[in-house]
UniProtKB/Swiss-Prot annotation:
Coiled-coil intervals: none
Gene assigned in the entry: gmk
Main location: cytoplasm
Protein name, UniProt field: Guanylate kinase
Entry similarity comment: Belongs to the guanylate kinase family.
Gene3D superfamilies membership: Guanylate Kinase phosphate binding domain, P-loop containing nucleotide triphosphate hydrolases
Subcellular location: Cytoplasm
Function (record text): Essential for recycling GMP and indirectly, cGMP.
Repeat recorded as keyword: no
SUPFAM superfamilies on file: P-loop containing nucleoside triphosphate hydrolases
Amino acid sequence: MTDTLPTVSRRGLMLVMSSPSGAGKTTISRALLERDPAIGMSVSATTRAPRPGEVDGKDYHFVTVEKFHEMVEKREFLEHARVFDNFYGTPRGPVDEILRSGRDVLFDIDWQGTQQMAQNARADLVSVFVLPPSVEELERRLRGRAQDSDEVVRKRMAKAGDEMSHWPEYDYIVVNIDLDKSIAAVQAILAAERLKRERQVGLPDFVTQLRGGE
């Protein structure tokens, strides 16, 4: 057996967080980004104009409508959608580069985007759906934010039912009763998924060397 064993590295993963508005996915996502240096937020491409202070390549990849359609035709997006008069999408290239480096990418997207990503990159995808403990609590949280009108809250509540119907399409479900416990649950999911053998690059050669080169 040689003194030097082959290096085992890890391929990164794509962590998708989805939930109805007010269930807590954004708060959980922010906590993950603050506490875990091995994961970063995905950067979307968009056709909308940059807002004051936004930096191209950091906040968004700003592209023309023509360029966006060209990228769609070339299948360069993991997922894409039209939102009102603008287009948004997740470029495949930058994400693949991050995954190869062993870092993870966090996505805050809805069930439709998750379906597209499952079709385009299932092996790298880990999806988590965050549920509220009750409909009453969901409405209380929405109203507690004090940033939406009664009409907007009603629309969000009406949309929540459809969004929650897609829970069986996700790998993991977290019922957000206690925020700290929910954050810990997602951290545990990440820890386990990172150790899956299919994400360990170089593992077969490593084990072969351990067994004496058989």
